[in-house]
Amino acid sequence: MATYTHFAKQPDVLKHLILCEVLKNETPQIYVETNSACAIYPMTQTPEQQYGIYHFLEKADEVPSLKDSIYYQLESGEMAKGNYLGSPALAMNVLGKQAKRFVFFDLEKSALENVGTYAKQIELSASVEIHHADSSRGTIELLPSLPTSSFIHIDPYEIDKKGDSGVTYLDVLIQATLLGMKCLLWYGFITGDDKASLDNYITSSLEKAGIKDYTGVELTMNSIRKDSVLCNPGILGSGILATNVSQASKDIILDYSNQLVDIYKDAKYKDYDGSLYIQHL
């Protein structure tokens, strides 16, 4: 089992709920994921997971649009078996055999082995490629060979730090966007200062690149503080940035984000305020 412990938490709910619906809308032939981690995880019922997937499943049960979501359908079935599906498994289940190619990057070999095993189980091995490599370099090198119909899922946590390739993950999104590809980027932050810095970095970088058509939304715990950490459920806020996607996908990103704020309005993380607020980029 891989060493990854960040799964089934509240930011994963945002990321994975939206990923599933956007993939269903966009139906790409090629799916690339920069930081795959595992396809499937055994649940451990930590406080962070209680605040994440368990809270979502309980509350979504009462909200028809969330209960009808692909994410709810896939995770509720797997959670009954004691497992959580990560983004590689969700993407493979949503796209299935209609996708010609899945490309997964990660630095954890055991995580990629997990992805490969899961692909075999659902009979998609023939279309799955795994790359044990730095994905900022690997993805940048891959982009010129991909058709514009490709979908790039960028999920590194830190989007403003340059890797060995000399580029950041926001640079990867910008390059792919300028080539006409559909992109979904997720990022996280733990303080208000982090959030403000990232917001400025994202908007100024997109403006410099001439990218005006994008959808950005952030969900942040009301427990966040300017430059300190009051509580730590993994991270205190996260954002989704989408480019070159359809209007239907843009609408879903905003709609589901607002619905998550609604179902978290009385939430608690341990004894802390677990409610969220939304901000658009």
Descriptions of predicted regions:
Residues 1-281:
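Class I S-adenosyl-L-methionine-dependent methyltransferase catalytic core
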